[in-house]
Amino acid sequence: MKQAVYVASPDSQQIHVWQLDSAGELTLLQTVDVPGQVQPMAISPNQRHLYVGVRPDFGIVSYHIADDGTLTAAGMAPLPGSPTHIDTDRQGRFLFSASYSFNCVSISPIDTHGVVQAPIQQLDDLPAPHSANIDPTNQILLVPCLKEDKVRLFDLSAEGQLTPHAQADITVAAGAGPRHMAFHPNHQVAYCVNELNSSVDVYQISNNGQEYHLVQSLDAMPADFTGTRWAADIHITPNGRYLYISDRTANLLGIFTVSEDGRVISLVGHHLTEAQPRGFNIDHSGNFLIASGQKSDHIEVYRIDQNTGELTTLKRYPVGKGPMWVSIRGAQNS
């Protein structure tokens, strides 16, 4: 099984395309020069397109993904603000862009060729939205707003319009700073990593996906850590057994085991990373985790122990300058 790994390096305006084999080895396939500082990335649900947010000319660059994982530029569309995080709906019809510094979220349609078009809606006055996450039902968009300690909820219509959900928001602990989210593969539980206190909140999803209730909040840091907390990313393995978060000050990944129903997580350890692990991802087999070192200009591959979730460092690889984002495309037959 071979997968493609994409690493975005904004300071050198590049995407490095790697092939990941079943032993966890990476082979460089392509280095793509991007028209701007490349930051968030998202892969289409059919795994045939890569979407990339760029600045200072705010926009989305669409790429076609070849069978071997290499990229060909297919178009560029504007955005109303600097893209901080992007996501598509689960049918690949719309792209959502959260702009932290511009306090907005926009929706852009995706045409039948998989190319993102100009936005059709913009939601303003959102206090520092750090991500835009479509729920498992493809009906609700969840937007963690870091500066108000809330996760906003919006209904998504078939036409790509967002309106406030009946449960308009989820309030998190004061000063927590909600940032990125992940969903359990059973579609019944959501997780949110909080940037400012490096904690993870666990939400039970009920009423046919319509309601979110906090069931657990857990510190992700070592007990003796006294520095400034600065969490960044969160991902769960495809089998739902292990959850990971990164913290950029401590240069580590927090490792959690997850109960069978997804509702209870337990911190079982930490693993040191490259300097400032801004982004990471887990491959589709659930065997490997790849993290970027924003200050080391390298990525590192770790093997996931299937019995404990613990990580073993395999190898580090040079990439562009200031790598921030890691996206992984599944094997051709996946």
UniProtKB/Swiss-Prot annotation:
This is 6-phosphogluconolactonase. Pathway: Carbohydrate degradation; pentose phosphate pathway; D-ribulose 5-phosphate from D-glucose 6-phosphate (oxidative stage): step 2/3. One of its GO terms (molecular function) is 6-phosphogluconolactonase activity. Coiled coil: none annotated. Pfam families: Lactonase. The keyword Ubl conjugation does not apply. It comes from Yersinia pestis. The keyword Metal-binding does not apply. Keywords: Carbohydrate metabolism, Glucose metabolism, Hydrolase. It comes from the Bacteria. The lineage of its organism: Bacteria, Pseudomonadati, Pseudomonadota, Gammaproteobacteria, Enterobacterales. GO terms for cellular component: cytosol. Belongs to the cycloisomerase 2 family. Catalyzes the hydrolysis of 6-phosphogluconolactone to 6-phosphogluconate. It catalyses: 6-phospho-D-glucono-1,5-lactone + H2O = 6-phospho-D-gluconate + H(+).
